[in-house]
Amino acid sequence: MLNMRKSHPLLKIINHSLIDLPAPSNISMWWNFGSLLGICLSLQIITGLFLAMHYTSDTLTAFSSVTHICRDVNYGWIIRYLHANGASMFFICLFLHVGRGMYYGSYNYLETWNIGVILLFTVMATAFMGYVLPWGQMSFWGATVITNLLSAIPYVGTSLVEWIWGGFSVDKATLTRFFAFHFILPFIITALVIVHLLFLHETGSNNPTGLNSNADKIPFHPYYTIKDMLGFIIMFLFLMILVLFSPDMLGDPDNYTPANPLNTPPHIKPEWYFLFAYAILRSIPNKLGGVLALILSILILILLPLLHTSAQRSLMFRPISQCLFWILVADLFTLTWIGGQPVEHPFIIIGQLASILYFLIILVLMPLAGILENKIMKV
């Protein structure tokens, strides 16, 4: 008789995805972030569900309800801070996961990569709407500034913004709909993750060399389940240190002041994981140009398969492209720093130079380096 996990209609799917899945024998810890993202998503959905039980999406009571969760609900403070800092862990894993895909040429799995980019946009939208819910100063003004960017769209812009707001300013209608979207989007993300995995399992995993590994595969369980467990432990360790010792380190102090439409904070800025895109947006004086640059800064990932000129898939044996990749990483750190700084000299010019360098490396220098490396290989 067949083993139940191999014969049962439901268990069979799980078995082929997590247990008997053939995996390359040489994948490194950089391949750990997919499963870490799954854990982060589960944590966010569970903590978010418990928060939603006590939260009220009304402008008069939203701020008080968050205070009530932290003060009066059993372990409400840890649920709230796990959710807030869990989002930061989610984005750290997400950026490392995308970086891994760029470094090792995983973008050549077109369907998997494109679904991944859609996932990135969806997660960013969800995080933005979640940031509005506590209804602090930065929540209110962040929502006002970011939604207002849509008014840069010619002809329909202003109507579109008012339609999203549900009125002539960010108010009760906006908060209610943002809460509804913030609640439903993680389930849409879960569905997209399943599609992402479905496409991945059509081709099998990439590996550090970028070569075909069909001749050398090992079962996912127990080898990579144990390896992933180590990643879970390290991530939870960092998350718990953050939550229990400095839960507000990554937040903004302005968000502990209730939203006040009559008083603008001196520096409006989003959460740290959006700062690189915010810096690119601010570096262009024109509103429409800034919005386009903001969208393109993420959408550029879709173009990576078209910009791949090298005969080799991975950067493992390509030193020139490696240098450019790490300059790009340093550039993203610079943009993140600039995004959190006030709009004044010298931050404006640094932001503009870093933004130009970001697009220049991806669109021009990396493809040229690929062509150059091909020529060197032939010599």
Swiss-Prot record:
It is found in: Mitochondrion inner membrane. Heme b b562 binds at residues 83, 182. GO terms for biological process: mitochondrial electron transport, ubiquinol to cytochrome c. Binds 2 heme b groups non-covalently. GO terms for cellular component: mitochondrial inner membrane; respiratory chain complex III. The gene is MT-CYB. Keywords: Electron transport, Heme, Iron, Membrane, Metal-binding, Mitochondrion, Mitochondrion inner membrane, Respiratory chain, Transmembrane, Transmembrane helix, Transport, Ubiquinone. The cytochrome bc1 complex contains 11 subunits: 3 respiratory subunits (MT-CYB, CYC1 and UQCRFS1), 2 core proteins (UQCRC1 and UQCRC2) and 6 low-molecular weight proteins (UQCRH/QCR6, UQCRB/QCR7, UQCRQ/QCR8, UQCR10/QCR9, UQCR11/QCR10 and a cleavage product of UQCRFS1). This cytochrome bc1 complex then forms a dimer. Heme 1 (or BL or b562) is low-potential and absorbs at about 562 nm, and heme 2 (or BH or b566) is high-potential and absorbs at about 566 nm. Component of the ubiquinol-cytochrome c reductase complex (complex III or cytochrome b-c1 complex) that is part of the mitochondrial respiratory chain. The b-c1 complex mediates electron transfer from ubiquinol to cytochrome c. Contributes to the generation of a proton gradient across the mitochondrial membrane that is then used for ATP synthesis. The chain crosses the membrane at residues 33-53, 77-98, 113-133, 178-198, 226-246, 288-308, 320-340, 347-367. This is Cytochrome b. It comes from the Eukaryota. Belongs to the cytochrome b family. One of its GO terms (molecular function) is metal ion binding. A ubiquinone binds at residue 201. Heme b b566 binds at residues 97, 196.
